[in-house]
Amino acid sequence: MFFNSLLTNFAALEVGQHLYWQIGNIRLHGQVFLTSWILLGALLVFISLGTKKMENDPKGLQNLLEFLWDYIRDLARTQIGEKVYRDWMPFIGTLFLFVFVSNWGGALIPWRLIKLPSGELGAPTADINTTIALALLVSLSYFYAGLSNKGWRYFEYYVHPTPIMLPFKILEDFTKPLSLSFRLFGNILADELVVGVLVFLVPLILPIPVMFLGLFTSAIQALIFATLAAYYIGEAVEEHH
């Protein structure tokens, strides 16, 4: 009885206040969709402005976008390999940009000034549902990469170099999305909570360096997420001898 009660209490725990949307029997965190749509819209506008008038000598936004393109290309080539990295560049780039914009949007935009009927806005990546969805998407992607490149030979990976590795490789398929999701969620949520507490206690000077540290951490977390996603895909398409 004690353990059942304890587990029930943990399941009922919530961090922050939420705006819920009820669709049939499904209850969604509405604030996550709102902030995601706002940030994705801003990202699309940013990319549209940067690619509106392409020039041979890039300047301004075009220069920044080309830098990001080259960076993502090098990351994908390094982690996935020369053979198929081009096929996965759009996916890795989209992951990186979404996580990066979500993290920085949570750190820079004063979402709490926007009043809702209930709940409060915040970084999409500070919600565990978002990070789990992203992590599961990565898992499905590397399964697809392995099967599309190797067919049924992909499953040889689970018994390479010895069949003893089978249970460990299966367990690894569960731990990969868990580590991806909880690492990103924990870091971004912790940053939001620390900044929120400091703004409440010392509202003038102290939160500023912490916010800059949060921006740096947010960028690093986006890079780690995209790099690990590319690495897992590269691992799936790699030929084992």
Swiss-Prot record:
Q: Which Pfam families match?
A: ATP-synt_A
Membrane association type: Multi-pass membrane protein
Subcellular localization is given as:
Cellular thylakoid membrane
Report the main location listed first in the record: membrane
GO cellular component terms, alphabetically, are:
plasma membrane-derived thylakoid membrane; proton-transporting ATP synthase complex
> Which Gene3D superfamilies did the record assign?
ATP synthase, F0 complex, subunit A (1.20.120.220)
Question: Origin, by domain of life?
Answer: Bacteria
State the UniProt keywords alphabetically.
Answer: ATP synthesis, CF(0), Hydrogen ion transport, Ion transport, Membrane, Thylakoid, Transmembrane, Transmembrane helix, Transport
Listed transmembrane segments: 30-50, 91-111, 128-148, 193-213, 214-234
Q: Which InterPro entries match?
A: ATP_syn_F0_a_bact/chloroplast (IPR045082), ATP_synth_F0_asu (IPR000568), ATP_synth_F0_asu_AS (IPR023011), F0_ATP_A_sf (IPR035908)
| Keyword Lyase applies | no
Keyword Nuclease listed? The answer is no
Q: Name one GO molecular function term.
A: proton-transporting ATP synthase activity, rotational mechanism
User: Which HAMAP family does the UniProt entry name for this protein?
Assistant: ATP_synth_a_bact
Q: How does it assemble?
A: F-type ATPases have 2 components, CF(1) - the catalytic core - and CF(0) - the membrane proton channel. CF(1) has five subunits: alpha(3), beta(3), gamma(1), delta(1), epsilon(1). CF(0) has four main subunits: a, b, b' and c.
Q: What does this protein do?
A: Key component of the proton channel; it plays a direct role in the translocation of protons across the membrane.
Q: Which family does it belong to?
A: Belongs to the ATPase A chain family.
Name listed for the protein in its UniProt record: ATP synthase subunit a
Q: Which organism is it from?
A: Prochlorococcus marinus (strain MIT 9301)
Recite the lineage of the species.
Bacteria, Bacillati, Cyanobacteriota, Cyanophyceae, Synechococcales
Whichever gene encodes this chain, its name is atpB
